[in-house]
Amino acid sequence: MTMDALEAMYTTRAMRRIKTDPIPELVQKKILDAAIRAPSGGNTQGWRFLLVDDSGVKADLAPIYRKCMDSLWSTIYKPRIDAAEANPEDPESIEFMKLVRSASYLGDHFEDYPLILFGFSQFDTSGGSIFPAIWNAMLAARVEGVGSALTSVFQFRLDEMNEVLGVPEKGGWKFSACVTFGYPTGRWGVAPRRPAHEVSYRNSWDGELGFEIPEPLWSME
């Protein structure tokens, strides 16, 4: 299967509502092979990728993930949730609560995702190598019609997650992100974002960019 590079980049957005159909081994190979083609600082390749498709392992991870989500909602996102609930008719509140429901769906159905990837890095404190690799994996999945969703919420309970996955205590391997994969039940689309000119500068911070991009330069049409 082939796909225009821009289509893959523009339409690889979080796809959390998925089917439980297994991901073929060939597709899994393409996901991992694409991941390791990403830039690697000093070509150290200080990354490890752990695939989980065993129902027992997923069942052990699911309650940990849900506890992590509870921690997320009650700490980092609590002010935004409170603000949205206080003003539910505001367009920003409506959009934010849609995100909350979507993220909660992933937690409620964590064990149902047919394939889950865990990315680990070694001495990559900036994430400059591991996250391009994870993004490559997600792009490769998109080309094969497989949806993905990235989360790092396991950071709240790393010891429990590491114990389930058998991550060694020595070696300096640190959890970076978790990505769920599955064939989506919904349609692909371009993720809504603030226009690039609202978050970009030229030559200095707050420097005038010189142009605007009011609409995505690629569309499904």
Where do the protein language model's features map onto the residues?
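A glycine-rich helix N-cap at a beta->alpha junction
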Residues: D70-E85, L165-P192
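Glycine/small-residue-rich phosphate/adenosyl-binding loop
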Residues: Q45, L51-I130
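Short catalytic-loop micro-motif centered on adjacent basic/acidic residues
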Residues: R17-I18, R48, G147-S152
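Generic N-terminal amphipathic, Lys/Arg-enriched alpha-helix
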Residues: A5-D21
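Small-aliphatic-rich amphipathic alpha-helix that forms the alpha element of a beta-alpha
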Residues: A34-I36, L115-L165
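Short amphipathic alpha-helical segments
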Residues: Q28-D33
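C-terminal helix-cap and adjacent tail motif
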Residues: A8-T11, F175-E221
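Glycine-rich phosphate/pyrophosphate-binding beta-alpha loops
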Residues: A38-T44
